[in-house]
Amino acid sequence: MIAKISDLADVQGGMVLSRKEAKNQKQSAFEYSRLTLRAFDENGNINRSELEIFHACESLENALFTKVGDVVIRLVSPMYPAYIEPGYENILVPSQFAILRVKGCAGIIPEYLRLCLAQKSVEERILSLESGTAQKTVKIKTVLDLEIPLQPLHIQQQAVQIDLLSRKRECMYRELIENERILTEYLIEKMIGGTNQ
């Protein structure tokens, strides 16, 4: 079965932060962690060290913050969709992003929605629909109109598990390669008599 994203999830664009920004830190009554474009990686992870502090002049609405179960996308290509897990909630979402919240009876799990949005074919479809824009921006309407395959829940869960295991393996391989590089440098330095002797 094929379903439109608009039938499966509510989509809300992030907030234009310049309207709520404190003129200086002394006027700042509220501080929030906020998403940045570089905080998202191609695997759907959010890098905490790339989040920024936003100083607001007033309290901001809860609807503009991440919640567990949200799928957040960048509104520039590539979208790098991310599933919000525990520990990543209450992060301010600026206007360069959109939040997708699965509707209660939609028959889709949020992790599967993220997985569908992360597919190369979806990214290519979005790029072809947004071809007139020079900066490769993604309109919320384009996302709402996307059609994705809606599999039975057990298939969705299996696909999510396969993706999760694959991403864990990739992370372990990267760590192994880095450790191998460090070991090789150390051994070569020892063999040729490096400066640290």
Regions found by a protein language model. Name each.
Residues 60-61, 87, 133:
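A structural connector/turn signal
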Residues 70-73:
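Generic structural signal for buried aliphatic residues
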Residues 75-115:
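A short beta-sheet element
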Residues 1-26, 150-197:
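Non-catalytic DNA-recognition/assembly elements of restriction-modification systems
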Residues 6-23, 40-68:
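Sequence-specific dsDNA recognition surfaces
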Residues 91-97, 132-158:
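A short glycine-rich beta-alpha junction/loop motif
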Residues 109-132:
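Glycine- and charge-enriched low-complexity intrinsically disordered segments
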Residues 24-32, 52, 64-66, 84-96:
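Short, surface-exposed loop/turn microsegments at beta-strand edges and helix-strand junctions
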